[in-house]
Amino acid sequence: MGRRKKKKFIDRWWVKFLMVAAAIFLIGEAGMKIWSSEAVQTRFVYMWPYQNEILEYSSKNKIDPFLVASVIKNESGFDTEAVSHAGAVGLMQIMPETGEWIASQMGLDHFDLEALRRPEYNVRLGCWYLGELEYEFQRNWVLMMIAYNAGRGNTRAWMQENGWNYDFNRIEDIPYPDTREYVKKVLRDRDKYYLYYKNKIKNY
């Protein structure tokens, strides 16, 4: 849902990340084994903050929690204060007008723009929206992620113009380069979250 503005603590995290990566590079093959280990990957690459909120609302909306984690990783880097140049807010980078529409569809009394910075509220609305997209695009994650990134209207237009059906999976055919890369990254990272966390989640 757009680029984001990083907070200072995110910048500090990147400094630590680069220091660790440099150290591993310097010690060669052994370092690469350390880098690819689950402990390092989950600590520096595939972190999962706000897991309780994600599990709760992904379950309520019957969507894949690992996909939600991947969306957040790619949208905001788990930065609750992230704001894109276009105005998308919070963990799942929800645009204010989209958030207002979601709130109305959910039957909420009112939409709270400032609350989008709160993890629980943002994830609640974002998971509902992902559930809506999953239903609309018949559980096709490629189409679902195209719609999340480029909009439902563009997705429908591309389906019509290019003869895509609900079995579409040719990511390379996506017209927007940014959306194409976004879909690749989200689906790749979803598989990594599944690999590292599937045995750590109860009742999954």
Predicted feature locations:
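Catalytic glycan-binding domains that act on GlcNAc-containing polysaccharides
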Residues: 30-204
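N-terminal Lys/Arg-rich, disordered targeting/topogenic segments
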Residues: 1-13
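Hydrophobic membrane-insertion alpha-helices, especially the h-region
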Residues: 15-33
